[in-house]
Swiss-Prot record:
Region entry AMP-binding, spans: 473-551
Molecular function in Gene Ontology: ATP binding; medium-chain fatty acid-CoA ligase activity
Pfam family for this entry, one: AMP-binding_C
InterPro entries in the cross-refs: AMP-bd_C (IPR025110), AMP-bd_C_sf (IPR045851), AMP-binding_CS (IPR020845), AMP-dep_synth/lig_dom (IPR000873), ANL_N_sf (IPR042099)
Presence of the UniProt keyword Nucleotide-binding in the record: yes
Gene: ALT10
Protein's UniProt name: Acyl-CoA synthetase ALT10
Residues spanning the signal sequence: none
GO BP: fatty acid metabolic process
Length: 566
């Protein structure tokens, strides 16, 4: 192992950098704040010492329950500086959800904002987390703003441990932990655990993932190179920083390319005005958020002048949305990655003249990532085992290939991939092949051009009489109908074919069911797809539900249909 190489600690030269690192736009109750790199390093150093004072040391798990903002950025960087593992959590979770997560991860410290006085009218977001933490006798530190760090702005941050008693007297008191030594920058190792996250759970129960400094840096360097990020860039972060694409794929790639991140406390209605005002050059959003942003007012119905590209990830972008965004003349880039592999390791890049070189669901394969396609050696092309049913003695029936055009499960290997799920040997056996490749659960193929093309999720692909049908292509065909607002394709049981195609559709608000029947929609889809891919059942719904990264909950819809709940 090598110390002080490839670590997520801001470089020493940043101590003298007066350029803006973070901008927090003004709100009704607070003025705009601009924090330079010099100031950010000073704040991080101060918080780093506070963490040591609180007994946080190497490999300690620190739960960060903070909304998007300066506090999150400074606390996150300081946790990594002290060789601890940062575990950002959604501040909007319920007390029950916090208890479940805290019980599994057993954090040495939980960091949150002070609860505002009732008279302030401010949101009490941390309250459920605080109740859950104290109920489990966990230590809680409140991140308060002070004026201890001064570089002209008078804004500083300092942590204070709030020694509150547990909610019930029959619980033991919160333990007092001795102080720890503050690590120097040279003490931080690239193999140290840096980030703990929980998987989205669309294909099963959420699992705990820890990524090291080097895991994250490999992914970050791919993004920085492919998007040609530099100190001249500015991004506006509207994705949650407790998601990997937010904290690593947006925030860290910005800071470690010397650029500036604009971080509003919530999605602003004047989003496009913010982009123009702050000189935003790029931003990331899931497809559903891109659709929402298109409804926000824009000056002369055009894009902000400094915008270099738009980026999308989390789920596949529908053709109609891509064409709408593309019409504004700004490159639209898609990215693909997982919590387990690091974010956006497969990402569209900008060519030399700045135009986006892309095809929908096609991604260049970076040199740092080895990709193979897993298929069955004794079954038809594209047939692959379900991870959860795979037994060790079945590996002899599988083969890996890079042959162009062969469809199978996408498997990856590289320094970006996690070491394994935490305390979950069964999940690791299912996820990793004996040769070290990680099974993504996504179906895809390597094209003759060398690009990776995604087909769909292994557990969501519909096997209709032995023919594999990706749900996204059916959804895209439905979305091209003028009356359709949202659509989710799902599998249904069928006596003849084993599985058939179901489609749940939400109509546009200005369109009634009388204007679009299931027969109309089937005919529309038939014009675009082969008859074999036309849904057998179409149901009209009031809402289509997505997970927190914008992926439609196809398995959930399938279950509800089977139970007669749609």
């Amino acid at each position: 192992m090598t110390a002080n190489v490839n670590v997520l600690v801001l470089p020493t030269h940043m101590r003298e950098n007066d350029s803006a690192a973070i901008i927090i736009p003004s709100t009704r109750s607070a003025p705009q704040k601009e924090v330079s790199y010099k100031h950010l390093v000073a704040i991080t150093d101060s918080l780093h010492r506070d963490l040591a004072h609180l007994g946080i040391t190497k490999a300690c798990k620190v739960a960060i329950v903070l909304p998007n903002g300066l506090e999150f950025v400074a606390v996150f960087l300081s946790v990594l500086r002290q060789r601890a593992v940062a575990a950002p959590l959604d501040a909007q979770l319920t007390e029950s959800e916090f208890k479940d997560i805290f019980s599994r991860m057993k954090p040495e410290l939980v960091i949150m904002l002070p609860i505002p006085p009732e008279s302030s009218g401010g949101p009490c977001l941390p309250a459920p987390a605080m109740r859950a933490a104290l109920g489990l006798t966990l230590r809680v530190a409140l991140c308060r703003r002070t004026s201890d760090v001064k570089d002209g702005s008078g804004l500083g941050l300092q942590l204070a441990l709030d020694l509150l008693e547990p909610a019930h007297s029959n619980h033991p008191a919160v333990a007092i932990v001795p102080k720890a030594s503050a690590y120097s920058r040279d003490d931080v190792w690239s193999e140290d655990g840096a980030l703990m996250l929980f998987t989205s759970g669309t294909t099963g129960a959420p699992k705990s993932v820890v990524l090291s400094h080097i895991n994250l840096l490999v992914a970050m360097r791919i993004i920085i190179a492919n998007h040609q990020l530099s100190s001249m860039d500015r991004t506006i972060i509207i994705t949650p920083l407790h998601h990997i694409i937010g904290v690593c794929g947006s925030l860290l790639v910005t800071l470690f390319s010397g650029a500036c991140a604009v971080i509003p406390d919530s999605l602003p209605g004047a989003f496009w005005q913010y982009c123009t005002e702050f000189g935003v050059t790029w931003f990331h959003a899931v497809p559903t958020l891109h659709r929402l942003l298109l409804k926000f007012p824009r000056t002369k119905d055009s894009m902000p002048p400094r915008l270099r590209f738009l980026r999308s990830g989390g789920s596949e972008m529908a053709p109609d949305l891509y064409e709408t965004l593309k019409a504004f003349g700004v490159p639209v880039l898609e990215v693909y990655g997982m919590t387990e592999t690091g974010p956006a390791i497969f990402c569209n890049h900008l060519d030399e003249n700045g135009a986006g070189a892309r095809q929908r669901s096609h991604y260049p394969i970076p040199d740092a990532v080895d990709v193979m396609i897993l298929v069955s050696s004794d079954q038809p092309e594209g047939e692959t085992y379900d991870k959860t049913s795979l037994q060790a003695d079945q590996y002899s029936n599988l083969k890996m290939t890079k042959e162009p055009g062969v469809i199978g499960e996408v498997c990856v290997r590289g320094k970006n991939v996690m070491a394994g799920y935490i305390n979950n040997s069964r999940a690791n056996t299912e996820a990793f092949l004996p040769n070290g490749y990680f099974r993504t659960g996504d179906l895809g193929t390597i094209q003759s051009s060398g690009q990776l093309k995604l087909v769909g999720r292994l557990k969501e692909v519909i096997n209709k009489g032995g023919i594999k049908i990706g749900p996204s292509e059916v959804e895209h065909a439905a979305l091209s109908h003028e009356s359709v607002s949202e659509a989710v394709c799902f599998r249904i049981a069928d006596v003849m074919y084993g599985e058939e195609i179901g489609l749940a559709v939400k109509l546009r608000s200005n369109s009634g069911k009388n204007q679009c029947t299931d027969r109309d929609l089937k005919q529309h889809i038939r014009y675009q797809l082969s008859a074999f891919k036309v849904p057998k059942e179409i149901v009209f719904v009031d809402a289509v539900h997505y997970n927190r990264t914008g992926k439609p909950l196809r398995t959930q819809v399938s279950q509800k249909f089977a139970e007669g709940l749609l």
